[in-house]
Curated annotation (Swiss-Prot):
Keywords: Activator, Arginine metabolism, Cytoplasm, DNA-binding, Transcription, Transcription regulation. InterPro entries: Arg_repress, Arg_repress_C, Arg_repress_C_sf, Arg_repress_DNA-bd, WH-like_DNA-bd_sf, WH_DNA-bd_sf. One of its GO terms (molecular function) is DNA binding. The keyword DNA-binding applies. This is Arginine regulator. GO terms for cellular component: cytoplasm. Its main location: cytoplasm.
Amino acid sequence: MNKIESRHQLILSLIMEKKIHTQQELQELLEVNGVSVTQSTLSRDIKMLNLVKVNEDDSSHYVINPIAPTRWEKRLRLYMEDALVMLKPIQHQVVLKTLPGLANSFGSILDAMEIPQIVATVCGDDVCLIICEDVEGAQACFEHLKQFTPPFFFSKL
């Protein structure tokens, strides 16, 4: 584990152990544990770890955001907004058509997301074939992927 990963693990364990109200308090706890960090680095760490402040009993403290999208979900949403041409379930598969040259990027993102219904992705230049175990799995996968498309994508003209 490298230095950044170790620091992130320590931050997460500190957040889970006790209520930390300020960045300065977190910075001091890191110091006690032998990790010296600047405020700007700590601020970036907080953002990377999806930590948010919640209000409770007239004070606020840091928690891990339970509904924060993963970086792969963010990336998929961006790709869907910029490069998706078609998304359609067909039997036990979902066909994802993209702008030329981007199908492999979609396939890599989908593989990294480890969506349970996806058995495999096979990609060409502008088509990513998403293979599922059965028709129900393909429909569930399609419904899951639809949530990453722009709001207007499936609207009727």
